[in-house]
Every structure is written in structure tokens, then in C-alpha cells.
Design a protein with these regions (language model features):
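Helix-to-loop junction immediately C-terminal to a conserved catalytic motif
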Residues: 1-2
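Conserved ABC transporter NBD signature motif
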Residues: 9-17
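Short coil-to-helix segment of the ABC ATPase nucleotide-binding domain corresponding to the Q-loop/switch region
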Residues: 46-54
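Conserved ABC ATPase signature
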Residues: 85-90, 94-96
Length: 185
């Protein structure tokens, strides 16, 4: 984090003031987030299980806890049967679900999904967004960044439209047509 410094205002996330966060606090702050990227970022030499477990191992989580949490989260995303597969043996949608499982395995209060459907076909895109909705219903705050108007319009959620760093819209699905130019521009 701290890729950008705000020109005005205060940015607070999960109780951290990002304007004043100290360097030594950044690792702890990052552990409070789950992040899913457009390009999956899976380690090709590791199995599905190990890709997910990696997020726990780097934070020194006990092996016993890893053995409990990884199968649980793989089941949550529908990949329990693929735990021993490698990324190149999976479809794009399955790879994205592995990335999602890895982001969720630490049970973060906030999940940021940055164009999570950018590299998968439209039908799988709806499955991924439905999975994000289910995660949200279970209590995790989900922030999804996307330019896909059609994808956003199928789900009844709050939509904030940002253009060049400025909020230009904040409302529901019914307000999207008003902001359509920002999605198509």
C-alpha cells in the first residue's frame, strides 16, 4: 500500500490511517486485506493447495491451522477436488478461484478484487462475481474494481464510479445509466 499519497483528505482502511501509517505497520495492515488480481498470480510449480497455503506460510501460521483452513477455503470456492492439481491443469475460471481462495484463507475483513474477471470468459465472470457476493453475505466487505458495466448491472449492490481519482457517482444499480459514459469512455 501507499502507492499513492492523497492530495487531500484522510484515507482509513481497517482502522489504519494510510496517510500516517508507519513502514513497520504496513505488513500487518496488508495481512488485514485479501487481494485478487486480474492475472491470477499463481505459482506454477505449486499445487492448488500449496498456492493457497503459501499465503499462510509466509505469515508463520502453524501447520495444523494450515491443514484446516486450506481445505475449508478450497471447498468454499468449489475446488476441493482440485487441491493436487497444478495451475496449468486448470481453466482460467478455476485459476481465478484459486487466487480468490488464497486471498480469503487469512479470513480478511476486506477483500479487494481488482478486475477479477478480466482474463476469463463472460459466463465464468458471472460465477466469480456471484462467489464474491456470497463472500460478502458471509460478512467480508468486498470492493470490486471493474469497468464491465454489464457485470455490475446484474447485481444489486452499491456502485461507486470514479473517474480520474474523483467520485462521480455513488448509488445503486439504477444509477448506472447516468454514469455509463465513464464505463464506455
Amino acid at each position: 500500500m501507499r502507492e499513492e499519497t492523497p492530495t487531500k483528505g484522510i484515507v482509513k482502511v481497517n482502522g489504519y490511517n494510510l496517510n500516517k501509517i508507519k513502514k513497520r505497520q504496513i505488513p500487518q495492515f496488508r495481512r488485514s486485506l485479501g487481494v485478487v488480481f486480474q492475472d491470477f498470480r499463481l505459482i506454477p510449480q505449486m499445487t492448488v493447495y500449496d498456492n493457497v497455503a503459501f499465503a499462510l506460510r509466509v505469515t508463520n501460521v502453524a501447520s495444523r491451522s494450515i491443514r484446516q483452513r486450506v481445505p475449508y477455503v478450497l471447498g468454499l470456492v468449489g475446488l476441493a477436488a482440485k487441491a493436487r492439481n497444478y495451475p496449468d491443469q486448470l481453466s482460467g475460471g478455476e485459476q481465478q478461484r484459486v487466487a480468490l481462495a488464497r486471498a480469503l484463507v487469512n479470513n480478511p475483513p476486506l477483500l479487494i478484487a481488482d478486475e477479477p474477471t478480466g482474463n476469463i470468459d463472460p459466463e465464468l465472470s458471472f460465477e466469480i462475481v456471484e462467489l464474491l457476493n456470497e463472500i460478502n453475505r458471509c460478512g467480508t466487505t468486498v470492493v470490486m474494481v471493474t469497468h464491465e458495466h454489464e457485470l455490475v448491472s446484474r447485481f444489486n449492490r452499491r456502485v461507486i464510479t470514479i473517474n480520474h481519482g474523483n467520485v462521480v457517482g455513488d448509488g445503486g444499480i439504477d444509477d448506472l445509466d447516468e454514469w455509463r459514459d465513464f464505463y464506455e469512455g
